[in-house]
Every structure is written in C-alpha cells, then in structure tokens.
C-alpha cells in the first residue's frame, strides 16, 4: 500500500509589505493560576497552560476555532473548569481547537501534560453529593444536596486533546478528558483524545450526553464510567496501538458503580450506542501485542452500563461480567447488551464471568437480544480498521455490520440518531471524523499564521491536510487574510515542482478547500507551498 504524506510549508508574500513569519512560532501567551473573569483565546496566538489553571465561577473561557493550546510538561499543565464556570470551545470541522503537547514533532509522548477537567453540579452517587477529582488537582465535583442534572458547563465541539494523561499513583490520575458531575445542559460532541497516558475519557457521575467521540492510541481505558454516571453516548471510536497498554490492564470500556462496588444511588448506567472498539489483535493468532491488554468491556463493581448497536473486536477477552451485583443486573435486565457484534476474541468464548452458576455466553446469545459473535475480526467486514495511521472502520459492502441495529428499546431516547447499521460509521454516508480528526498527531506541525508588523494582526493559514498519510487523494484547506493572486503548489523532497493546484485571484476571509489526487506519484513525503501576492 502506497503512503503519501504532506509537510506544510507556508510562504506568504505581500508586495510592498513587511512581514514577520510565525510558522512553528514559539508560545505567545502563558496561562497560569486562577481565571476569575471572562477570557477569550484567539487563534492568532499559541497558548501554554502552566500548572493547574483554574477557571472559577462565574468566569467563562471562550476559545476561538483553530486555536492551539499547549500543556507544559514540567508543570503538568492542566485546564480545569470548576463548578459554575464555563468553557466555550466551539471549533469547526475545518478549524478544530487543539490541546496538545509542547514537544517537537516526533518527540511527543503520552503524559506530556495534564489534560482537560470539567466539574459540574449534577448528581453523583457519593454520600453528601460531592467528591474530589482524582489526579491531585483538588477539584470538587457534584451538586451536593441540591444537584442540577441540567447543569451547563459550556461546549466542547470539534476539539482534539493530544498527549495528555498523567498517572500520579494507581487510581489517582489525570485523564485526557475528565467530566465530573457534568450536567446534560453541557454540549460534548466531536472530541478526539489521542495518546492519553491514562484513560482517554472518564465520567465521574453526572448526566452529560455526548456524540462523536474518538479514543486513539490511549494507554489505559478508552471510555471509563463510574460514580453514578447516567448519560447517553452515541457514535464513538476506539483504536488501540498493540504496543501501548497500561500495567494495570487496558480495556475498551471500564465501568464501576463506585470505587468499592456499593449499591449507592444513582447506579452507574450509561446508555451507549453505535460505538466501534478496535482492540490490538487483527486476528486471534496474532500475538505481537502488549500482554497488559485485557477486555473489550469490563463491567464491574455493581455498574449497570448497557451497550446497544455496537462493535467490539480484537481483544483477548471481549466481555467480563465481574461480580455478583453485575450478574444480578444482567439476569434482571437492568444491564443490557443488545444488537451488538463481538469478534476476534482470543481466550475461550470471549464472553465470560467470575460467577459460578451463571453462563455469560448463554446470556449474551439470548435470541431476543440480537447479538452476534464472530471468530475473526475480518468477519465483521470493516474496510481497514487496524491501519494505525489511517484507520477505516467503515463497513464494506456486504458487511454484517451494515444491518442489525434496533432502536426499539425504551432506553434509546430521542437523543439517539436512529441507524440501520451497528458500530460508529455508516457504510453509505460521509465519515463524521473527516476534516477535523488527526490520526498522526506525532508528526503534525502546528501553524498559527503570519503576522504583519504593526498594530494590525492579519492571519494567513495553511491547515494540515486530511487524511495524512493518504492514498490516493487528500484535502488541503487554507484561510486568506488578504485579497490577492494565490498559488498552491506541490513539491517533492528534492524541491522539484510536481503540480500546481491553484493559480487564481481569491478573496480574503474565506476557507478554501482543494482536493489533491496523488495517484500518479510514488510513495514519499511531499510539500505544499502556499503563496499570495497582494493585488
């Protein structure tokens, strides 16, 4: 398979104007300490989180689409939205907001900085109604004796969180994105967490709903739910690197009612539909994976997590129903697995329990549940799910995942978009991760633009192409701050011009997108050069 990758070289030429080039610019502003009044972060600057940055009520932090925010490594830079404060991170498909490592391309690693924490006033199942977020930040979450399940902590939309997640001690970690007691008035959609040093996403109680989530090459669990979380989740993807797993065991889903498995109310009962969880094993004979990989879903400690219309494949064990409380929830039908596919499970039948007298495999295969199980991941018929730099988890023609979904269950409320397919992606519609997700953040050079000297700031951006690497075509987008004659050319590594994609007069203030077909090129690295001459 040929693989073509772009590195973006931005050259901006305005006749009769003096320019400062800010490609790969250093940090423009350091954010630290407490934020007690409203702040606005502009995409014309790069920001650095230093230490634990607390946004306190009634402040709102608003982040412009396209903004790049680094987390400082030595100080464990972390953004914390405390109860009563808000974050408005409303990116776009063309201009996602990116929280990432400050380290150079090629030298980034899980745990390079802390992560993003949002604390709300919704219900949790801890006595007294409040608790402290793990990870050493001291953040309090939950609404106490007067919780508000409709609490609004703001918006995360088209946001990437890359190389976060610090494990201070076992069970005391900052995850990529922590949502503690967050209410359903909050908007969470189109969020990718990549290379998290601990869990990618973790919900500590609360009622917040979310759609379009990606966990990419995380270290520990992909989606962790506990302390009475009762939100609805739809359309999620997890892709695992076979070499990266946590010493304590890595799972796709991990869920607890609380830390000791009490029956405290409300019980942890997230309703999950249309997730695709891709484990480390491309087939059951594959042995070159980290031995700390465990289960596609580990339901334990009295949780009642329920999964519908989803795919879990490529794990040593597919599903573990752990403990008597989980067993009785399963047999009592408060814990449900319905209309889902499990495949490519290495050990035994892949569906298991530690409870004598309970046959988890028979329970899973109850005909009315509509579940299916396949020996090999390939039988699910996804196009290229184990491609680690450009995964394609879309069902191919005649895939069994193209049909079999059901939304007749009363738990699948109007929040859920009804589909006929199971898993995260439609076989017939455009992928929802296109244009904003990044499956190679290790090699991405973040560019904020070029600034004209003087008091007026003008921005000129060439965005990272998607997909990258690509075969045979990719999309290239750019933003202009001035009207002018604009050219976009492609060069090889020797500097020879390969192709002119654009040579036209264009207007400022628009995002332009071009498609580059590289089917006639050999594998290698190519450069996109964008120039403009002011008219």
Model-derived features: positions:
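Bacterial Sec-dependent N-terminal signal peptides
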Residues: 1-25, 448-450, 458-461, 477-479
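Intrinsically disordered/low-complexity terminal segments and short unstructured peptides
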Residues: 16, 136-138, 152, 309, ...
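Extracellular beta-rich repeat passengers
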Residues: 23-62, 72-84, 91-92, 96-198, ...
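C-terminal outer-membrane/trafficking sorting elements
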Residues: 453-535
């Amino acid at each position: 398979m040929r693989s073509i990758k772009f590195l973006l070289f931005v050259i901006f030429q305005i006749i009769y104007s003096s320019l400062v080039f800010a490609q790969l610019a250093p940090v423009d502003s350091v954010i630290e300490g407490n934020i007690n009044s409203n702040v606005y972060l502009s995409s014309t600057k790069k920001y650095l989180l230093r230490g634990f940055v607390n946004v306190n009520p009634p402040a709102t932090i608003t982040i412009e689409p396209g903004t790049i925010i680094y987390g400082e490594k030595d100080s464990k830079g972390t953004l914390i939205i405390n109860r009563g404060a808000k974050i408005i991170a409303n990116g776009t498909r063309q201009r996602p907001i990116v929280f990432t490592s400050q380290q150079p391309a090629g030298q980034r690693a899980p745990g390079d900085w802390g992560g993003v924490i949002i604390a709300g006033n919704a219900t949790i199942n801890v006595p007294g109604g409040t608790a402290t977020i793990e990870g050493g930040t001291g953040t309090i979450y939950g609404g106490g004796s007067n919780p508000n399940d409709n609490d609004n902590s703001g918006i995360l939309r088209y946001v990437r969180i890359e190389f976060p997640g610090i494990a201070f001690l076992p069970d005391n970690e900052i995850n990529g994105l922590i949502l503690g007691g967050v209410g359903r008035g909050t908007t969470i959609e189109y969020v990718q967490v990549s290379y998290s040093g601990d869990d990618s996403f973790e919900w500590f109680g609360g009622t917040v709903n979310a759609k379009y989530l990606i966990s990419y090459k995380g270290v520990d669990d992909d989606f962790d739910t506990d302390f009475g979380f009762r939100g609805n989740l739809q359309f999620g993807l997890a892709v695992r690197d076979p070499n990266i797993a946590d010493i304590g065991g890595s799972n796709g889903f991990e869920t607890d009612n609380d830390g000791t498995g009490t029956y405290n109310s409300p019980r942890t009962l997230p309703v999950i539909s249309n997730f695709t969880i891709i484990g480390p094993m491309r087939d059951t004979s594959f042995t070159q994976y980290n031995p700390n990989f465990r289960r596609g879903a580990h339901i334990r400690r009295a949780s009642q997590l329920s999964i519908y219309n989803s795919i879990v494949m490529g794990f040593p064990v597919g599903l573990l129903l752990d403990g008597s409380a989980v067993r009785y929830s399963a047999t009592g039908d408060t814990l449900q697995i319905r209309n889902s596919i499990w495949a490519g499970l290495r050990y035994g039948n892949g569906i298991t329990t530690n409870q004598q007298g309970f046959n988890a495999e028979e329970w899973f295969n109850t005909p009315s549940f509509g579940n299916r199980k396949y020996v090999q991941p390939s039988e699910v018929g996804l196009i290229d799910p184990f491609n680690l730099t450009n995964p394609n988890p879309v069902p191919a023609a005649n895939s069994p995942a193209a049909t079999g979904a059901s939304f007749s269950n009363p738990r699948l409320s109007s929040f859920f978009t009804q589909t006929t397919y199971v898993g995260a992606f439609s076989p017939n519609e455009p992928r929802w991760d296109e244009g904003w997700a990044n499956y190679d953040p290790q090699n991405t050079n973040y560019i904020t633009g070029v600034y004209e000297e003087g008091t007026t700031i003008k921005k000129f951006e060439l965005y990272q192409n998607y997909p990258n690497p690509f075969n045979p075509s990719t999309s290239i987008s750019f933003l202009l701050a001035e009207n002018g004659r604009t050219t976009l050319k492609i060069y090889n590594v020797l500097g020879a011009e390969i192709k002119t994609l654009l040579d036209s007069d264009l207007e400022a203030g628009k995002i332009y997108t071009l498609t580059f077909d590289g089917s006639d090129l050999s594998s290698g690295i190519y450069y996109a050069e964008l120039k403009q001459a002011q008219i």
